[in-house]
């Protein structure tokens, strides 16, 4: 069975005109007849290409301010016609076959992303004819080639060159898959937008106002992720896995990072690298975060990245073995040398990597070196957690407090140095699994207690960690990701030598907790913000 199909007639109708002129010129050189609409047709005609307006092809003008342009049997019959089966019907209705459809859709996403977008603006950017043609061509991929991405123009031309102006079923099927994904994402965006609007009063005279109150979350949740890579296995070797990225998020991340060298990233590598990178983003000055099993085991500020790394490593060298290291500045040669000479590391990630640092890390061929780019601001987005039979959706935890937000509740006021350490410690605690306790001193973690069912045991573990590494807890500060339900955590901290505590507050026993701090001569501040992490 011959599955190669010649392209003799193409319909081009695009909102994003990137590369369309050059593509059309190449099609014309192949002898392809060009049909087009609106602005696309004008662009091609202005550059001397023979183009037939869709309205001339159908014999029916565009109507309703362009809302109806291509919804016509001569268009859709030409796309949907089954070659070798529907020729008699086509001849009877004067329908000509359309072999290639090149369409991308009205820019709905960028329209509604504009804070000044009205409901009317959104409605006028809902494409009707475009998705209809895309779906028709994708459905009939047995005979028709559909292109929705400008990045595929060169691929189609290469295919035509190889096959004397024709395309194979293989490429048509692959392009059809991309087309269905494209329309699914488009419809999902529209459904999400409208699902976020709550009808206040259907009988109001001001329809725009009635429909423009926004809800927190849509009635149905539509999101599309694109597979970036298959993974060797999942969290455990008996689990299959793949890594998908969110095309709507434009932010420096492990998902957008470029791997410069090393073995393929594993499922756990990706999860741990995300935890390390998101933590280090919290700091302005040179900072290093070392993560093991999604928990920071060492975090520090420094006069430069080398100093920050040395101090972060000092917190827990044992746990740092085989860990993930993240920086918030360009990885330099000195820091790279210190890492590869000192420890086994799975992943290093930084906004950028100097050539000298690349050359040094290259000596350890298995080390995964990632460059994620600089970050300016954090993108507002959602966190997801699957439960059996459902999905939990919430805003990302981007909350953080500054000096103006905290409240001193103890008799003793924190010193200026303690306040700096408190805010540093609080940033770290946000990224430690609950129950989370972090000891810190002079911009460096001293001990980290993570993931315990009892808060007091997390505090004890942080102290044990510090003791094991010979770090002095005396006059360190402590952060707790949630309030203390009993005074035992305060007593344990005092016994370890903690001088100051930062915590959310909000316990029914707050007075008892504050009294305990006062008894020990400790300073205590409340943030009014919790940072549970599960």
From Swiss-Prot:
Q: In which pathway does it act?
A: Purine metabolism; IMP biosynthesis via de novo pathway; 5-formamido-1-(5-phospho-D-ribosyl)imidazole-4-carboxamide from 5-amino-1-(5-phospho-D-ribosyl)imidazole-4-carboxamide (10-formyl THF route): step 1/1; Purine metabolism; IMP biosynthesis via de novo pathway; IMP from 5-formamido-1-(5-phospho-D-ribosyl)imidazole-4-carboxamide: step 1/1
Keyword line = Hydrolase, Multifunctional enzyme, Purine biosynthesis, Transferase
Q: InterPro entries this protein is in?
A: AICAR_Tfase_dup_dom_sf (IPR024051), Cytidine_deaminase-like (IPR016193), MGS-like_dom (IPR011607), MGS-like_dom_sf (IPR036914), PurH-like (IPR002695)
Q: Name one GO biological process term.
A: 'de novo' IMP biosynthetic process
Which reaction is the catalytic activity of this chain? (6R)-10-formyltetrahydrofolate + 5-amino-1-(5-phospho-beta-D-ribosyl)imidazole-4-carboxamide = 5-formamido-1-(5-phospho-D-ribosyl)imidazole-4-carboxamide + (6S)-5,6,7,8-tetrahydrofolate; IMP + H2O = 5-formamido-1-(5-phospho-D-ribosyl)imidazole-4-carboxamide
- The yes or no answer to whether the keyword Nucleotide-binding is present is no
Enzyme Commission number(s) of this protein: 2.1.2.3, 3.5.4.10
Q: Does the keyword Hydrolase apply?
A: yes
- List the coiled-coil residues: none
Q: Where is the MGS-like domain?
A: 1-148
Q: Where does the record locate the signal sequence feature? A: none
One GO term in the molecular function aspect is: IMP cyclohydrolase activity
GO CC terms, sorted? cytosol
Matching Pfam families: AICARFT_IMPCHas, MGS
Task: Give the domain section of the comments.
Answer: The IMP cyclohydrolase activity resides in the N-terminal region.
Query: Which family is it part of?
Result: Belongs to the PurH family.
Q: Which NCBIfam families match?
A: PRK00881.1 (NF002049), purH (TIGR00355)
Q: What is this protein called?
A: Bifunctional purine biosynthesis protein PurH
Q: Which organism was this protein described from?
A: Shewanella denitrificans (strain OS217 / ATCC BAA-1090 / DSM 15013)
Name of the coding gene: purH
């Amino acid at each position: 069975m011959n599955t190669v199909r010649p392209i003799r007639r193409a319909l081009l109708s695009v909102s994003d005109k990137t590369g369309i002129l050059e593509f059309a010129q190449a099609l014309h050189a192949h002898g392809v007849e060009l049909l087009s609409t609106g602005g696309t047709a004008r662009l091609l005609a202005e550059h001397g290409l023979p183009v037939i307006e869709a309205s001339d092809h159908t014999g029916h003008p565009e109507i309703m301010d362009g809302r109806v342009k291509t919804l016509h049997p001569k268009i859709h019959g030409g796309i949907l016609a089954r070659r070798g089966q529907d020729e008699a019907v086509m001849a009877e209705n004067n329908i000509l076959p359309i072999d290639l459809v090149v369409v991308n859709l009205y820019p709905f996403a960028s329209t509604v992303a504009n804070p000044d977008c009205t409901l009317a603006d959104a409605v006028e950017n809902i494409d009707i004819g475009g998705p209809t043609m895309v779906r028709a061509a994708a459905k009939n991929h047995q005979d028709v080639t559909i292109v929705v991405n400008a990045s595929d123009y060169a691929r189609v031309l290469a295919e035509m060159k190889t096959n004397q102006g024709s395309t194979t079923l293989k490429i048509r099927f692959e392009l059809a898959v991309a087309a269905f994904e494209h329309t699914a994402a488009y419809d999902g965006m529209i459904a999400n937008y409208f699902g976020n609007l709550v009808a206040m009063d259907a009988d109001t005279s001001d329809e725009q106002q009635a429909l423009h109150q926004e809800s927190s979350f849509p009635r149905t949740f539509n999101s599309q992720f694109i597979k970036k890579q298959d993974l060797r296995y999942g969290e455990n070797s008996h689990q299959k896995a793949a890594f998908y990225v969110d095309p709507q998020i434009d932010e420096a991340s492990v998902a957008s990072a470029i791997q410069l060298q090393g073995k393929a990233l594993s499922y756990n590598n990706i999860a741990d690298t995300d935890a390390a990178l998101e933590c280090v983003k919290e700091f302005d000055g040179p900072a290093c975060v070392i993560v093991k099993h999604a928990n920071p085991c060492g975090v520090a500020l420094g006069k430069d990245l080398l100093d920050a790394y040395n101090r972060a490593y000092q917190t827990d060298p044992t746990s740092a073995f085989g860990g993930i290291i993240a920086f918030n500045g360009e990885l330099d040669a000195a820091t790279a040398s210190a890492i590869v000479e000192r420890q086994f590391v799975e992943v290093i990630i930084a906004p950028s990597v100097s050539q000298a640092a690349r050359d040094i890390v290259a000596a350890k061929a298995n080390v995964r070196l990632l460059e994620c780019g600089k970050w300016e601001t954090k993108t507002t987005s959602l966190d997801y957690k699957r439960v059996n039979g459902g999905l939990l959706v919430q805003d990302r935890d981007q909350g953080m407090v500054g000096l103006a937000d905290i409240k001193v509740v103890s008799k003793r006021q924190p010193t200026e140095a303690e306040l700096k350490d408190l805010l540093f410690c609080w940033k770290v605690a946000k990224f430690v699994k609950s129950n989370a306790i972090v000891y810190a001193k002079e911009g460096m973690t001293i001990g980290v207690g993570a993931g315990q069912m009892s808060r007091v045991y997390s505090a004890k573990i942080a102290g044990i960690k510090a003791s094991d590494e010979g770090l002095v807890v005396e006059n360190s500060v402590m952060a707790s990701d949630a309030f203390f339900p009993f005074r035992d955590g305060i007593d344990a901290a005092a016994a370890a030598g903690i001088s100051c505590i930062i915590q959310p507050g909000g316990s029914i026993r707050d007075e008892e907790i504050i009294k305990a701090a006062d008894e020990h001569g400790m300073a205590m501040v409340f943030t009014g913000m919790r940072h549970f992490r599960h």
